[in-house]
């Protein structure tokens, strides 16, 4: 997948909350999933995919990236983003990560 990049940018915020985004870049445009990290909870907030990049399953790629990050770092997830909720409905193997 030449031209693709997944990264996380972090910026500190008050009360030990880290905010950032998981990103995928293609053809000079960036799709992203915004998150917060508070203690051991990863909040998956909002996915944005530029119109030109829609239909390439980037929202699914970003959802999987966020969930894999939570899994590897032993975090729970608080899912607000509808795209991530849709992904979870199709991938129940991640359901144990979701805050109840």
Language-model region placement:
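A short, internal acetyl-CoA/4′-phosphopantetheine-binding micro-motif in the GNAT/acyltransferase core
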Residues: 47-54
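Short, hydrophobic/aliphatic alpha-helical segments
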Residues: 45, 64-65, 69
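N-terminal first-folded block
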Residues: 2-42
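C-terminal structural segments of small proteins and small subunits
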Residues: 68-100
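Conserved acetyl-CoA-binding loop-helix of GNAT-fold acetyltransferases
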Residues: 55-66
